[in-house]
Structure formats: structure tokens, C-alpha cells
């Protein structure tokens, strides 16, 4: 494993290895055990999309690992002014030990890895969100013990979250059901991948997706860069709000996850959100531990 570009690239064993390491690093963090696996290492962080959780979790994480971060905002770097990605990749590779990028186009992440000579981590693209899904899987395993026999459902937009959850969930052996309106489905590449698994369901009915689910997941209906579509999306997703009715179709001990920020009253009700604040904020914390595991896996000598 040289990079984390998308979960499609990883085997089940590689995903489980990252989760096991994340569990270990979380334990050590909670018990004050230092783990400077990346002492003196530098992570360049490129942000072409604004961020709270991604920036803080990566910066805190690399510091806890004994390294440090250099932050490049899109408008404050040459990559944001039109410098070819291949040139940025080759220059940064001379300065730093790893690159994390949060951007729009998946191709930009792939090109950084292609032309650079240091590990590249996808902090988010419009196509996928691998770090978030590793945190989600870590949280699911914490609450449920294992992935065996579990059903995970995602209700909402066929966006980067849904794409990565389908891939990650199926690869670790869960049944995966997703509900989204016509016109907001995952891309064909993801559906072609899912077609190779027996435990996948695609529907436009949230109640069908949620039936007997152990984990119910949602995300915002309007992602960054889609603000002009808000009114149309709110109309299309009417009936897709995670409420008590939808939760009633899931198992009685089902947990809810949301990658945040949440728009309460849109994709999830205030009541369901607060009833599941424990797993939701554990999920947010686990971004730190999962990403530390990714950095150690990729950047440790």
C-alpha cells in the first residue's frame, strides 16, 4: 500500500490492518502512551475545499505521531493558480514526507500520486471520502464487535460518502443497502463494483433500505459546490429524512452515523441526531485515530 487514493484500491486485509492499528493508536492515546512513529516527518496538507474536521484531525494526528504539518490553502499556493499538478507533486516530494489533499477532482489526487514520490492521502474528493469511511468502519466495529452479519444502510445522496461506504462496507463483509432518488444515484463505476457482491441493494425507498439495518447512515443533501441546486435537492429528497419512522424499520439497537456537519431538520431530525450523539461524535473522534493509522502505514520508515 503506497497511497490512500480510494477504497477501491484496498483489499479487505489492508482495510482491517488499518482499523486494527487505529484501535491500538486510540488505546495508546487514551492511556497517555507516546507513539512517535513519524518523528521528524512532515505532512503537506493541501486544501482546495475548506475544512474543520479534516484539518484539525490530520494536524493533531501528525503532531501526536511526532511529526508536523505544513498547510497550503488552494488560493495561497501555486496549485490554486494554475501550476500543473505534476509539477506540484514533484516539487513537494523534494520537501515533505507525505501529502494529504482535500479537493474536488479525483484525478488531481491520482495525478499527485502518479507524478510524486511520496505517499498521497485523499482527504476528500467529489468522488470519494476514504478517511471518513475508515473512521465509520472503526466506529461500527467498536459498537457492534465485528462486521459479521451486519447490515449497513445509507439514505440520501449518491455522493462521495455513499460511494465510499458501498465499497468499504461490502469489502469488510457487511450487507449494504442504499436509498436515493432517481437522478441522485451512485456513479456506474460504483454500481459495477457492487454488482460483484450478493449483499447489495439499491432502492428509492428509505424504508426498504432501513429494514433490519444495524447501522443507519446519512449525509447532507447539498454538498460543497452544489449550493445553486439546494431548492431542487430539498424537493427531490423529501421523505429521505432520518426520523423515528425510518428508525422504526431498523433493528432496535441500530446506531446512526453522520460525518458532520449535520443539517438537523433536513437529512436527520433533531430527535434522532441527539439520541445517537454518542456514536456520531465517536465517529468524528475516530477520524483522528483512523487517519493516524493511515499515516503510519504509509509514512513510517
Regions found by a protein language model. Give the residues of each.
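Anion-binding alpha/beta catalytic cores of soluble intermediary-metabolism enzymes, centered on
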Residues: 97-168, 258
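Adenosine-phosphate binding glycine-rich loop
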Residues: 253-254, 260-301
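Glycine-rich phosphate/diphosphate-binding loop of Rossmann-like nucleotide-binding domains
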Residues: 48-60, 143-218
Amino acid at each position: 500500500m503506497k497511497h490512500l487514493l480510494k477504497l477501491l484500491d484496498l483489499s479487505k486485509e489492508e482495510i482491517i490492518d488499518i482499523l486494527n492499528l487505529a484501535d491500538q493508536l486510540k488505546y495508546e492515546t487514551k492511556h497517555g502512551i507516546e507513539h512517535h512513529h513519524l518523528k521528524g516527518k512532515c505532512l503537506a496538507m493541501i486544501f482546495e475545499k475548506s475544512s474543520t474536521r479534516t484539518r484539525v484531525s490530520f494536524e493533531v494526528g501528525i503532531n501526536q505521531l511526532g511529526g508536523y504539518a505544513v498547510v497550503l490553502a488552494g488560493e495561497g499556493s501555486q496549485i490554486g493558480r494554475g501550476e500543473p499538478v505534476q509539477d506540484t507533486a514533484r516539487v513537494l516530494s523534494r520537501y515533505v514526507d507525505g501529502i494529504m489533499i482535500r479537493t474536488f477532482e479525483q484525478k488531481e489526487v491520482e495525478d499527485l500520486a502518479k507524478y510524486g514520490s511520496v505517499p498521497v492521502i485523499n482527504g476528500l474528493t467529489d468522488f470519494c471520502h476514504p478517511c471518513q469511511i475508515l473512521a465509520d468502519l472503526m466506529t461500527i466495529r467498536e459498537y457492534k464487535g465485528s462486521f459479521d452479519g451486519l447490515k449497513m444502510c445509507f439514505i440520501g445522496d449518491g455522493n462521495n460518502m455513499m460511494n465510499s461506504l458501498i465499497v468499504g462496507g461490502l469489502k469488510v463483509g457487511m450487507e449494504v443497502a442504499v436509498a436515493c432518488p432517481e437522478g441522485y444515484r451512485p456513479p456506474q463505476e460504483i454500481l459495477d463494483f457492487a454488482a460483484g457482491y450478493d449483499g447489495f441493494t439499491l432502492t428509492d425507498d428509505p424504508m426498504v433500505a432501513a429494514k433490519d439495518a444495524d447501522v443507519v447512515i446519512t449525509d447532507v443533501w447539498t454538498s460543497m459546490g452544489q449550493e445553486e441546486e439546494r431548492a431542487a435537492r430539498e424537493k427531490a429528497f423529501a421523505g429521505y429524512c432520518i426520523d423515528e419512522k425510518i428508525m422504526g424499520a431498523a433493528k432496535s439497537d441500530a446506531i446512526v452515523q453522520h460525518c458532520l456537519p449535520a443539517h438537523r431538520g433536513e437529512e436527520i431530525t433533531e430527535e434522532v441526531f441527539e439520541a445517537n450523539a454518542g456514536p456520531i461524535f465517536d465517529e468524528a473522534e475516530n477520524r483522528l485515530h483512523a487517519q493516524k493509522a493511515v499515516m503510519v502505514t504509509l509514512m513510517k520508515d
